């Protein structure tokens, strides 16, 4: 399609006069005169050149001014919305419907602005190329356009990421504070409550991958933002960007943020970026805050025969991959991770799982580790961890991981062969790992191999290319043809945790997105496989097998919305007819089979399903559960399942038992009296225990502070014990002193044991989110009683002896006399304790 026709079709009517006047600029080029066969020199003069440049500059000013005004208008709306969320009083006055409508308008405007920028930017590039092609005798206008684009930072951001993050924050506010029916689907809203996986590695998952054209990327992000918040990298991540929850759903807009020139400007700019403030009126206003999407670099390993590539492409179960990965520039000394991943796929269910070995490396040790099988870094790291008090089991596991990867590199003769760089945007509900959407854009593949011994691309003695990672502006401009490949689309991946053998969860918005014209599904797509195929696929010496999706890259994946809608309708009708046939077959099978056999088969099926779910949810065996299974199966064989009133009450949220018993209680009698239907299982986790454990720091500190206080009491009692015991010979009552020393000694032991036991008990209750009381009064009461009794005994014995001496029962001539004022008090105490 000609660009002029595309521009006319994609123009947003209310903004029609603000687009580039492409047809007028074409007329100024006198294209028709050139096509008539006249000489370019005769028909094109300096005056024509000046008129064209002046018109081009005016069009730039017009488009840029309009774009700035609209962008700032959206910013003002977002500022007003954010202002209404800053205090509790303002939040109470918010009209949720009006708030949501304004937010929808901002998202819609941002989406239209992105399309506006793309169309106009493409128009300016094409008209400049047309000028240089038609009038080669005149200086190229490309350099002029480059200068003007730096002065007028038009379309400098490849994506409106800062706007999207602010909108995402406001959508999250709306979801959290208002039960709006259109804000998020009910199924998605309940996901965070039902998800109880504390670690993604504990469950299998399904992965769905799609290609997204650059023209549709903004609309795709806008659709996702209505249901999932964007995950903002508050800092440079240093762990697994796929599974570690190292992200914050927060927007940190810096008022003095600078401008970031996007990748489209790189075709015109040698340095690839520019920083500039833009003055509007009398005050400076930030046009594009910096993007939060991190640049991830991955260095893949393989051997001369590309065995890892072939094994992965042929879907050999357990085929491993090895990669080095870091975020940002290597000169900034980021955390570098060496990762060995082994994916396994269940061919029956389609579920995927993986095992991963991850080592954090230092750049200066990588060469010796990879090429010389040097264990010095392993020994250095283990010694450091041992000095810090790391447990022996962890050190042994770390040593095994080092040996595993080193042996893998040596046995397979691996070396770095391919570099992939991309920007990642992630969408996920914080704390809920059941569904996650990532979009990787600006994907670039670069050869990093030394397969050709005569002309190696990478120094064979170094693990990475020094020319790319050097401290020079835009080092990619030095790449030669054939050394790099730009992937034309963005890659969207939807990862869904499988709690059973079901297919993709019934999220309507996901179905609408994945079946729309905006995305093109590519099952089993892999960044590594695509990179090897694009850079090494033409050389039969290296690669003889290619991925099935390569031919699709030669076609335009964009679809007509109407055609995509009709195709989706046909697909849904076909699926519905298949489901109807299957349901009919199930009904017929139930009628034809006797009741007893049907019940027995259904019971076996339910038990198998329950075993599968137990494998996903509980990784610890239980003897009690093992002995109870035969009893449950016997009950199933003796009864035929009926959908009774109690089950309907459960679904309705009413009284869940007709006899007053709770079928979900721990009582085995009441639980066995109620039989759940197929596919419904007894909950094993409370909703309050779903998700990761998040307890305020003051709770942990209070428990530790109490333990420390008990330790101080234990220390004081031990000092008292040994002081008394060491001074027994000097005491006036040696037997009493000896007895008290032993009493205090046992009291000291009790305090230490009691303190540690209480600390562990409270720690368990805190981690388990238990509602039980944390008080433990027995210990303090017992210590207080023992101390009081010993003091009273010591006091009584001492004063009895003093009374005897005072009354002449013992020779007291050597005792000093008391003042006359204290004599009545002494007599009272003597009478109280007796003689």
UniProtKB/Swiss-Prot annotation:
Gene Ontology BP annotations: engulfment of target by autophagosome; intracellular phosphate ion homeostasis; microautophagy; polyphosphate biosynthetic process; polyphosphate metabolic process; vacuolar transport; vacuole fusion, non-autophagic
Keywords: Coiled coil, Cytoplasm, Cytoplasmic vesicle, Endoplasmic reticulum, Membrane, Phosphoprotein, Transmembrane, Transmembrane helix, Vacuole
Disordered as annotated region, ranges: 564-610, 616-635
InterPro entries in the cross-refs: DUF202, SPX_dom, VTC_Complex_Subunit, VTC_domain, VTC_sf
Biased composition (Acidic residues): 617-626
Keyword Transport found: no
Positions in the Cytoplasmic compartment: 1-709, 757-778
Transmembrane parts of this sequence: 710-727, 736-756, 779-799
Factors inducing expression: By low phosphate.
Superkingdom: Eukaryota
Regions annotated as coiled coil: 385-413
Vacuolar side: 728-735, 800-835
UniProt cross-references to Gene3D superfamilies, sorted A to Z: VTC, catalytic tunnel domain
Modified residues (Phosphoserine): 43, 45, 50, 195, 198, 270, 274, 589, 592, 621-622
Single GO term (MF): inositol hexakisphosphate binding
Annotated ranges, domain SPX: 1-145
A Pfam family the protein falls into: DUF202
Compositional bias annotation for Basic and acidic residues: 564-586, 597-610
Gene Ontology CC annotation, any one: endoplasmic reticulum membrane
Primary subcellular site in the record, as a coarse category: membrane
Similarity section: Belongs to the VTC2/3 family.
Quaternary structure and interacting proteins, as annotated: The VTC core complex is an integral membrane heterooligomer composed of the catalytic subunit VTC4 and the accessory subunits VTC1, VTC2 and VTC3. The complex exists in 2 different sub-complexes: VTC1-VTC2-VCT4 and VCT1-VTC3-VTC4. The VCT1-VTC3-VTC4 subcomplex is mostly found on the vacuolar membrane. The VTC1-VTC2-VCT4 subcomplex is observed in the cell periphery, probably ER and nuclear envelope, but localizes to the vacuole under phosphate starvation. Each subunit contains 3 transmembrane helices. VTC1 is a small membrane protein without hydrophilic domain.
Domain notes: The SPX domain has very high affinity for inositol polyphosphates, such as myo-inositol hexakisphosphate and 5-diphospho-myo-inositol pentakisphosphate (5-InsP7), and moderate affinity for inorganic pyrophosphate. Its affinity for inorganic phosphate is 2 to 3 orders of magnitude lower. SPX domains may integrate inositol pyrophosphates (PP-InsP)-dependent signaling to adapt cytosolic phosphate concentrations to different metabolic situations.
Function text: Accessory subunit of the vacuolar transporter chaperone (VTC) complex. The VTC complex acts as a vacuolar polyphosphate polymerase that catalyzes the synthesis of inorganic polyphosphate (polyP) via transfer of phosphate from ATP to a growing polyP chain, releasing ADP. VTC exposes its catalytic domain VTC4 to the cytosol, where the growing polyP chain winds through a tunnel-shaped pocket, integrating cytoplasmic polymer synthesis with polyP membrane translocation.
Other observations noted: Present with 2630 molecules/cell in log phase SD medium.
Name of the protein: Vacuolar transporter chaperone 3 complex subunit 3
Organism ancestry: Eukaryota, Fungi, Dikarya, Ascomycota, Saccharomycotina
């Amino acid at each position: 399609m000609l660009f002029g026709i595309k521009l006319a079709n994609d123009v947003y009517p209310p903004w029609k006069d603000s687009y580039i006047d492409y047809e007028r600029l074409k007329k100024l080029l006198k294209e028709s005169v050139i096509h008539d066969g006249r000489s370019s020199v005769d028909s094109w003069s300096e005056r024509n050149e000046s008129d064209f440049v002046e018109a081009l500059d005016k069009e730039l000013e017009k488009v840029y001014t309009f774009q700035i005004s609209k962008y700032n208008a959206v910013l003002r709306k977002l500022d007003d919305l954010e202002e209404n969320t800053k205090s509790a009083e303002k939040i109470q006055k918010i009209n949720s419907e009006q708030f949501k409508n304004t937010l929808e308008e901002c998202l819609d405007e941002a989406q239209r602005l992105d399309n506006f920028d793309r169309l106009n930017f493409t128009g300016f590039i094409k008209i400049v190329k047309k000028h240089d092609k038609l009038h080669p005798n005149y200086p190229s206008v490309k350099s002029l356009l480059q200068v003007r684009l730096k002065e007028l930072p038009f379309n400098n951001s490849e994506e409106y990421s800062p706007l999207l993050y602010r909108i995402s924050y406001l959508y999250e506010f709306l979801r959290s504070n208002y039960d709006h029916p259109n804000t998020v689907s009910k199924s998605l809203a309940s996901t965070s409550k039902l998800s109880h996986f504390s670690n993604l590695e504990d469950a299998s998952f399904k992965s769905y991958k799609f290609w997204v054209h650059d023209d549709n990327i903004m609309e795709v992000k806008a659709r996702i933002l209505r249901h999932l918040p964007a995950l903002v990298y508050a800092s440079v991540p240093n762990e697994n960007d796929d599974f570690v929850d190292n992200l914050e759903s927060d927007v940190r807009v810096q008022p003095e943020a600078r401008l970031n020139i996007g990748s489209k400007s790189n075709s015109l700019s040698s340095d690839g970026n520019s920083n500039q403030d833009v003055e509007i009126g009398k005050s400076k206003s930030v046009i594009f805050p910096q993007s939060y999407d991190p640049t991830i670099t991955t260095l893949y390993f393989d051997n001369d025969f590309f065995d890892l590539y072939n094994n992965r492409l042929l879907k050999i179960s357990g085929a491993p991959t090895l990669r080095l990965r870091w975020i940002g520039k290597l000169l900034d000394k980021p955390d570098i991770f060496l990762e060995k991943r082994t994916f396994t796929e269940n061919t029956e269910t389609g579920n995927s799982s993986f095992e991963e070995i991850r080592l954090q490396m230092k750049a200066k040790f990588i060469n010796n580790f990879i090429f010389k099988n040097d264990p010095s870094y392993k020994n250095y790291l283990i010694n450091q961890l041992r000095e810090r008090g790391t447990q022996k089991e962890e050190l042994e596991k770390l040593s095994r991981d080092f040996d595993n990867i080193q042996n893998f590199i040596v046995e397979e003769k691996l070396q770095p062969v391919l570099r992939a760089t991309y920007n990642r945007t992630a969408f996920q509900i914080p704390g809920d790992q059941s569904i996650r959407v990532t979009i990787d854009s600006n994907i670039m593949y670069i050869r990093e191999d030394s397969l050709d011994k005569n002309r190696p691309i990478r120094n064979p003695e170094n693990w990475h290319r020094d020319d790319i990672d050097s401290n020079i502006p835009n080092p990619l401009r030095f790449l030669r043809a054939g050394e790099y490949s730009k992937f034309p689309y963005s890659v969207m991946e939807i990862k869904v945790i499988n709690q059973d053998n079901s297919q993709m969860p019934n999220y309507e918005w996901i179905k609408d997105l994945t079946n729309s014209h905006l995305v093109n599904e590519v099952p089993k797509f892999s960044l590594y496989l695509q990179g090897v195929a694009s850079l090494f696929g033409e050389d039969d010496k290296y690669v003889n097998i290619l991925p099935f999706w390569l031919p699709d890259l030669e076609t335009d994946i964009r679809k007509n919305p109407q055609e995509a809608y009709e195709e989706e309708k046909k697909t849904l009708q076909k699926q519905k007819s298949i489901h109807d046939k299957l349901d009919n077959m199930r009904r017929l099978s139930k009628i034809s089979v006797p009741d007893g056999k049907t019940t027995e088969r259904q019971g076996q099926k339910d038990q198998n399903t329950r075993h599968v779910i137990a494998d996903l949810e509980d990784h610890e065996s239980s003897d009690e559960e093992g002995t109870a299974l035969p009893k449950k199966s016997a009950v199933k064989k003796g009864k035929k399942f009926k959908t009774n009133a109690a089950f309907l009450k459960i679904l309705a949220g009413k009284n869940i038992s007709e006899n007053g018993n709770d079928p979900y209680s721990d009582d085995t009698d009441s639980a066995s009296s109620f039989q759940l239907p197929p596919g419904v299982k007894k909950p094993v986790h409370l909703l309050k225990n779903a998700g990761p454990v998040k307890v305020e720091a003051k709770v942990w500190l209070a428990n530790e502070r109490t333990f420390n206080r008990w330790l101080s009491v234990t220390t004081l009692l031990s000092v008292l014990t040994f002081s008394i015991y060491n001074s027994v010979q000097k005491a006036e009552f040696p037997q009493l002193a000896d007895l008290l020393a032993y009493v205090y000694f046992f009291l000291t032991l009790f305090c230490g044991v009691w303190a540690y036991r209480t600390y562990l008990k409270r720690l368990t209750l805190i981690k388990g989110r238990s509602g039980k009381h944390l008080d433990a009064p027995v210990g303090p009461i017992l210590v207080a009683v023992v101390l009081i009794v010993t003091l009273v005994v010591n006091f009584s014995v001492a004063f009895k002896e003093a009374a005897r001496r005072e009354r002449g029962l013992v020779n007291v001539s050597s005792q000093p006399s008391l003042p006359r004022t204290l004599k009545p008090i002494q007599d009272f105490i003597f009478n109280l304790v007796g003689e």
